[in-house]
Amino acid sequence: MTPQLILASTSVFRQALLQKLGLAFGSCNPDIDESPMTNESAQDLVLRLAKAKAKAGATHFPHGLIIGSDQVAVIDGKIIGKPLNRENAIKQLSQASGKVITFYTGLALYDAKTGEVTAQVEPFTVHFRQLTAAQIVAYVDKEQPFYCAGSFKSEGLGIALFTRLEGRDPNTLIGLPLILLTEMLLNHGIDVLAD
């Protein structure tokens, strides 16, 4: 019997991405402390948090196959996450203007029944165009990207902020690397292309 697939996230963006695969799934709020540890790298942080989110979902779904994901960006060597408000979003985009920024998305798949966890970090690089203060304010006011790492929604108007995108899977930038996820699911006997 195939275990129940669970997305340990309340993100509407991640839920919409997972729906693209046409699989039945549930979701839950992982409710974990997302604070970085002292001197923790961006890659280690997102990997740890993705695993923690997936494992937290097992509390509600002890026989589930649980997906956890986390994303941060690195600007000038500093880890940034969700801005949470207008002022921080404007600040983040001002810092990113004209720069090349790497986003790191951690993805974990946890089999709550066996305790097996598979996890990996998927990088994605974004080349920001040189933005004026007026463009940044206008963008933030239009899309209000307060709950998106890096303060933009690449699936919407945010695409106008960039000159180039580099990575294996554009879904990674939205928060859920679907190519990597389909590979992980296949290793658990779930083929998204099967009838």
UniProtKB/Swiss-Prot annotation:
The record marks F13, Q71, E155 as: Important for substrate specificity. One of its GO terms (biological process) is nucleotide metabolic process. Pfam families: Maf (PF02545). The active site is at D70 (proton acceptor). Keywords: Cytoplasm, Hydrolase, Nucleotide metabolism. Its EC number is 3.6.1.-. It catalyses: N(7)-methyl-GTP + H2O = N(7)-methyl-GMP + diphosphate + H(+). NCBIfam families: maf (TIGR00172). This is 7-methyl-GTP pyrophosphatase.
